[in-house]
Amino acid sequence: MVAEKCFSKIRVRESDKAKEIYLNNDELQALYEMPLDGLEAQVRDLFLVGCYTCQRYSDYSALSANNFTTTSRGTKVVRFIQKKTNTPVVPIMNDNLLRIAERYNFKIPSITDVILNRYIKDILKRLSETVPSLLNTEVTKLTMRERNMEERGDVEFMRNEDGEVIKYRYDLVTSHTARRSGITNLYLTDLFDIVQMMSISGHKDQRIFLEYIKLSSDEIADKIMAKLRQSEEAGNEGLF
C-alpha cells in the first residue's frame, strides 16, 4: 500500500516525455481523403473527429447521435459534457466532420485507444508516401517499454549524431494528438480569441490550454513575419 501511494505521486518530467506533435490542416485533409475501408477507415474517421472537435479520446470516442445537434440559429454543433472535468462544450461542425458523422448515421465508431494508436501510425506511414512532411523526424524520448525492448535487443531505434532518439512524425501520433492538432490548427486560423478557443476545448486554465499549441520556433517566426507583413500592407511601418 505504501509503495502504491509513493508511485502515485511520481510525475513525468517534461524533459522525459515523448515528443508531442500536431498534424497540420494539409496533413489532416490528406488523411481525410485517403482511400481506406473497414477498420482502417473507422480508425481514421474517429481520429479526425477528435481533431475537428479538439477533444480528448474519452469524449470523442463516445459521441452518439444525441450529441449532434444545432443551435437556435441553425449552427451545426456537437453538444456534450466532458467526462474528465464535467465541463459542457459545444464545438461547431465543419464540413468534414459533418460528412464523417453522416457516414455513420451520427453514431461514431467505438474503437479502443490501443487499437487506434496502433492503426493510426500504420495508416499515416502509408500516407507519408504522398505527404512527405510525415517523414520528418523529431527528437523524442523512449517509453519504459521501448527502453526495455531496446535493452533486450528486440529493436533498435534511430538516433541522430548527438545520440538522441529520433522518430518519424507519423510514428509520434497517438489518440491524444487529435486534441493537440485541433487546438493548434484552431489557433493558427487567427480567427478566434483565447476565450472562444477555450470554450471549444473545454479548458479553464489558460496556461494549460497554451501547452496544447505545438508550434516549432520556425513556425512561430513565420507567424510573426506574416503578421508584420499584414501590418505593413495596412500602412503601419517601423515596427522593426
Task: Pin down the residues of each PLM region.
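Short, polar N-cap/turn motifs at the start of nucleic acid-interacting alpha helices
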Residues: 67-74, 172, 191-212
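Catalytic-site neighborhood detector that most strongly recognizes the C-terminal catalytic loop/helix
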Residues: 22, 84-86, 200-226
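Conserved tyrosine-mediated DNA breakage-rejoining catalytic core shared by Y-recombinases
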Residues: 9-12, 62-100
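Short, basic (Lys/Arg/His-rich) helix/loop patches that form interaction surfaces
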Residues: 106-107, 121-199
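Basic, Lys/Arg- and aromatic-enriched nucleic-acid-binding interface segment
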Residues: 2-57, 114-115
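Short, charged phosphate-coordinating catalytic segments
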Residues: 1-5, 50-74, 194-195
